[in-house]
Amino acid sequence: MKNRLISSLFLFLLLAFILHPALHSAEQNLNDVILRIQNSITQKDVTAYLENFSDEIKAVEELNFNDKFDLFGMERAALFKTGETVLSENEAEVYIHALFQNSYSVIIETWHLSLLKLDDLWQVQEKNIVGNITSLYMVQIPSNRAERVESVEIEHEDIKLSFKNALLFYDNIPELETALVIIGKGDVHFSPSDSIEKHLLKLSYKKDFLKDELTYAYLRFSDQFFRNNIKIVKNSDDIDYQPTQKETSEAHSIFSRHYPRSFTVENSLNKELLSTLPQSDEAVIGFKGKKLGIFTYIYSPFTNEEINLYRWKDKKIINIYSPDSKEGEKRLFLSFARMFEVKNYQIDVSFEPEKSFLSGKAKIEVEPKVDSLDRLKFKLNPKLHILRITDEEGRALFYSQDRLRETLYVYFIRPSTKNKTCSIEIYYRGKLVPPELVADVIAGPQVYSWKGRFGVYIKFLPPDYETYLFSRSAIWYPAPSENDYFRARLKVTVPFPFQCISNGELIEETLLRDTEEVEDRADAKSAAFVFETKHPVKYLSFIVGKFTNAGEDTESLPIRHFYSSGIDFMRRGILQEAKNIVRFYEERFGPYPYGKLSVVRRLWITTGGHSPASFIILNELFQVQDGTVLVPGRSPVDLSRWKEYFIAHEIAHQWWGQAVTWKTYHDHWLSEGLAQFGAVQYLRQKHGDEVLETIFGKFSRWTEKKSKWGPIILGGRLTLQDPLAYQAIIYNKTTLALNMLMDLLGEESFYQVLKEFFRRHKYSAASTQDFIQTIEEISGKNLDVFFQGWFGSYSLPEVNVSHSVKKANGGYTLSLKIDQREAFIFPLWIEWIENGEKVKKMVIVDEVNEEFEIKLEGKPTKIKINPNSAVPGKFH
C-alpha cells in the first residue's frame, strides 16, 4: 500500500513538471539575471547594471549604484539569493542579500526584487531594501598609521595604564578611532572599588590591587572613550616615525591574538571575521604584565555588572562587578530577554555514538516583545557547523556567530511584529563529545586497581561507559540566550540497540532499517524516539545508552526506573523511594511540576547525578570482583552514607533548578542550596533528628574551611576560585542558612514561604530579592540584616558565650551572655541534661551583645552551646 502511494505521488510530481516546464525554465533564468547584476556590480559597469531594471526605476538605481561606490567608497560586491517565488511564467519575486565591501567596511542589504519577463528576459520592475542595513568593519593593525609618542595614559574607573616613549599603531578605519596597539615600557594599576572583589583579589595575589610592568597593550573602544579616557602626548621629534619590520610584525602578532576575542562575529555570507564598533563607553583593554601575564579588562555599560577582569592563562574571571554610580549618572542595560521569548521547539536530531557525530534540525517559534524585531540571539556550540537557516517562507537568513562566546545571531529579512509568533529553522551538524558535568558530582577514582580480599593489588581494565548525556552545557541545539521557558517536541534517532530518554513524555518509538519502519528487532539498524513536553522547561536534555526498563509505578505520578549496561544489580525499592520523596516535597514545596519522573541509573566515572526536567540521572561507580565499590575521596557534599541522599537531592531539583531557576549567577543557591536543604530534610524525616548532628557538623566544618572564598551570592564564580568552595558555600552554607531561617520563622511558616515562592515563580527565573520579598510579605519581618550577613558576606560569626546556673524561686536560672564581633542574626540552640532528660532550647541572637535567662525546674548539667553545629562560625 505504501509503495503504491509513493509511486502515485512520484507520477503526479512528474506530470506536474511536464505540464509546467515554463515555471522550471523561469527559475533557471532568474539565476541568469542575478548573475548579470552581480557581474555589472563587480565590473562597476553602471550601464550594464541598469539594463536589468525597468525604465521607471533606472534613475533611482543609478543614484544607488553611484552612492555605493562614490559616496560610501565600496570597492566590490557579492549577491546571495536567499529565496524566490515564481508567481507565473512571466512574474517572479526574489530576495537577495547584497554584500558590499571595501578595505575596511562592509554593508549588507536585503533586496526584494519584483521581476517581469519581457521579450524572454527578466527585468526588475521594483527593488526595495527590506529590514535594517547592517554595517560591519574589517579592522586591521598595523595600518598606514603609526607613531612614537612621549607618553600614553589610559584611565577608566578602577584601572590605569601608563606608557613612556611608546610606539602606537592605529587601526585602518578612517575618521574615527576604534583600536590601538601600544608597544613599550609601561605599567598598570588596577584596584576594584567593590569590597568583596578586593577581598577576592587579595586571596589570589595577597594584595587587593594589581600592579605590574607592561610590555604592550591592545585596546578596542568607542570614539567617545578614545577622546575622554586616552591621553597621548606626542613627540615632535618623531612625527614621521617609520616602524621597523620587527616592530610591525610584533604589532600584527598582538592584534591577531586579541582581535578575535571581542566585538567580532563570523558572518554567514563570506565566512569572514567582521567587527562591530563599540558603543557609548564600551571598551576592552588587553595587556601583558611581566609577572601577571595576559589579562583583559572589559567595560560594558549594557550589562548588569559593567567591569570584568579576565586572566587568559587559565581562562578565569578574576573580578566582575558594577562600580558605584556617580551622582546623576544613569546606567544603561539592554537585555535580549525583553526583545523576544522562545515559545516552542521542534527538534529532530540523530546521534552516532561511535563517531560522536550529531546532526539536527531545529524549528524555533519565538514571540517578539518589541516592535520591528530584526534579529534573534541564541547559544550554540561552535563545534556544530550550521548548514543553513531559513524563515517561515523557506528563505535563507543571514546570520553571524561569536564562536568565543558560543553565540549565534540570526537576522530577519523583514522585522517581525510585536506579540505575533514567528519561526525559523536551523540545520546543523558536527562532531560533539558530551562535556563532563561539574555540578552535583563527586570525583571518582582515576586509577583502576584495588586491594582485594587477600591483600593483593590487582589492576584491571576500566569498564565501558556506554551512556552519552547531552544537557545544557553541551549547547547541542540553538538554545535561548536568556532564561526562557518553552515547550518542545524532540525526535532523537540513534543506532539500534541504543535507546534514548529525554524530557517529557515518550509518545512514539520506531525501529528503522535505513529509512523504512520495521517491526522485527532483528531487522532494525536504528531507532527513533519522539518526546513531547506538556509543561514548560528551561532547557532540553537527552541521554543515549543501552537501558533496561526495571519497572514503573503509576499509582499517582508515573515513575519509571531504568539502568544502563554495566550495572548488574536492580536496586529494589528505588521506585518506592522516589515516590516517597516526591510526596515529601509536594507537602513542603508544592505540586510536582512535571507529568512524569524517570529515574536513570548509569555506570559512570563519578558519583552524583544530574536532574533535567522530568527525569534524573544517578551515577554509579564500577564494582570490582569482590563486590567492593571504588569510593571517591573527600567531598563537602558527599552524604552517600545515606543511600537516599543522591536521589533525594536530584528529585528536589525538579522544583528548585528546573521549575524555578535562577536569574543570575548571584542566585545559584536557589537551585543547589534549596535542593540540598530538601535532601537533608528528607534524610531527617526518614532517619530522625540524630542525622542532623553528623550532617550539620560536616557542613559547618566545610563552611568554616572555605568561607573565605566568598559569600553565597558569589554563586558559580566560587567554582573559579576553588571547586570545593562552591560546594561548601552554595550547597552546605545555604542549607545551614535556610535551616536557621526555618528556626526563626517556624517550620509551618517557612514551608508556607517556599510554597508561595514556588507558586509565584513556577516556570520562570527568580532572584534572591524575590525570595526575600516573599518571606517578608508572609512573615511580616524585615530580614535584610539576616540575608546580608549569611548570603551577602563571606564572614562568619565569632561569638563568645558564657553561662552560669543559679538557684531561683525553687528552681534554677540558666543565664547566657553573648558577645559577637559582627552583627549576625541567628537562632542559637542550647542543650543540657535536666532530671535525666535531654532538653533543647532556642534563643534568637540579633544584637552584638545580648543576655538571656532561662527558667528551669531542675539543675542543668552537660550544657552545650550550638550542639549540632547548626550555626557555622567560632563559638568560644
Place the predicted regions along the sequence by residue.
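A short, amphipathic edge element
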Residues: 67-93, 107-109, 338-344, 793-802
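Hydrophobic helix-coil surface modules that form long, contiguous segments used
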Residues: 335-361, 367-370, 379-382, 387, ...
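A surface-exposed beta-strand-loop module
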Residues: 136-149, 157-247, 254, 376, ...
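Short solvent-exposed beta->alpha transition segments
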Residues: 31-39, 43-95, 769-773, 777, ...
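Exposed beta-sheet edge and beta->alpha loop/turn motif
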Residues: 74, 86-138
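Non-catalytic accessory/interaction domains
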Residues: 278-281, 287-337, 379, 467-469, ...
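Hydrophobic alpha-helical and helix-loop surface patches within well-folded domains
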Residues: 531, 561-817
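Extended, low-hydrophobicity, Ser/Thr/Pro/Gly-biased non-transmembrane segments
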Residues: 224-226, 231-336, 427-545, 867
